[in-house]
Amino acid sequence: KLPDMGSPADAIFSANDEARIGRMIMQSIRASGQVVEDPLVTEYLNEIGSRIVAQTNEGDHDFTFFAVEDPRINAFALPGGYIGVHTGLIDATRSEDELAGVLAHEVAHVTQRHIARAVHANSRQSLLTTAMMLGAMIAAAAGADSDAVQGAIAIAQGTAAQQQINFTRTNEYEADRVGISALAGAGFDPYGMASFFEVMSRQQTTSPEMRAPEFMRTHPVTTARIAEARSRAKDYPLIRSDDSTSYGIARARLIVASFDTPEEAVTYYEKRPYENQNSIERYGRAVAYQADGRYWEALDIYKDLLESNTSVIAYHIGMGETLVALDQPRDAIATFEKALALFPRNAPLVIAYSERLIELGDPIRAHTLLLDLLNNVPPTPEQVRLIARAASAAGEEAEAYYYMAEYQLMIGDLTGGINYLQQALQLPELQEIQRIRFEARIDFIREFMTEEQLKMMQSSRPVGLAALQE
């Protein structure tokens, strides 16, 4: 086997460059508040995304899948393996296979390094585009006006970037080919990708007066491309399976969140009589009742769902949360503890239980559970922020500062991370072992900071732990 000499694109846009730029864009998207911070939705997307990635034989890429609160039908791949899916697209899918098909396509854009290859193919124009994109990101991160922030987000989500970077027709076909192979290997219907393309194409054909779905403008879909996708799917065994419960749970939660008011969500789920609804529709109804403060009605549904199926974590979480809202802490804790015994170290469950424990005045137990989860399961930024919140409520101020620093690092804010660590070093009750740990962390972070970031750090103001109450 010949040694890997690398790609010509690496000379202009290396994998490290992609990772760094991806982190910057993600920092801006998170700052906009558009990332859906729902642990059940996030875990689901990463679960099926990981199944697809496992079929690509690309161990060199780290992937993060996340949902973006946006009714437009679109998905996008960012440098560094960040895959974003609009809530509008998830709602538009008719099956889990279609959603998996979209994710497989976006994963292929990353594994085939299409952005880097496009930069190499047209380096002058693409580097200018990259410079413009980074300028928008920096402006947004620096607190520029809303137009600048929205412009940065639009670029990051692909409405501008994918047009400016200009994925070629060859790249789109390659993403389809590689994606369909991964789709089939992961156990999904290989026709899922073509099926979603057809839905988008049909929507535009039957309603030409409507604006084309964002997905079709950033990922042009032609009749020939649909036919090619279907032809490639024939090379793989036909897989027919029901949608997973997790797919239905995620869609139901996003549907409830999409309404302007909880009352509208309740109206939506009450259109059909309860006895005619399936379990997912009943779950959506319970979530809507919960959001609307109709806790007794929600509790009745969760009890009904758990009597039929105890294997769905979301049902346990919903019941526990509702019992807390009904001021029944003993029953709530018993519900969560029983669920923990069934599903140890499940991230959405531990997060939901820990939030309720803090609310019920037991932050020490919450802190213990969250640290155990952190040591065994890769965390999300919001999960680390919750550790800081639990530590603060438990009187562990130094640890609260430390984990707020880690949260800032996870969202790409190195300056903010050092800021929190430096404040922790000023605490009079700081233990020597903590001082050594915090100083070592600061030294480690500095190695990754630019001269400009180091200057910004010198002029930054202390932020304290007030943000934990937001």
Q: Could you describe each region identified by the protein language model?
A:
Residues 5-12, 23, 35, 43, ...:
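Extracytoplasmic and endomembrane cell-envelope/extracellular-matrix remodeling and assembly machinery
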Residues 67-81:
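Catalytic zinc-binding patch centered on the HExxH motif and its immediate surroundings
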Residues 85, 101-109, 113, 175:
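Active-site recognition of the HExxH zinc-binding catalytic motif
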Residues 97, 107-124, 142:
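Catalytic Zn2+-binding segment of zinc metalloproteases
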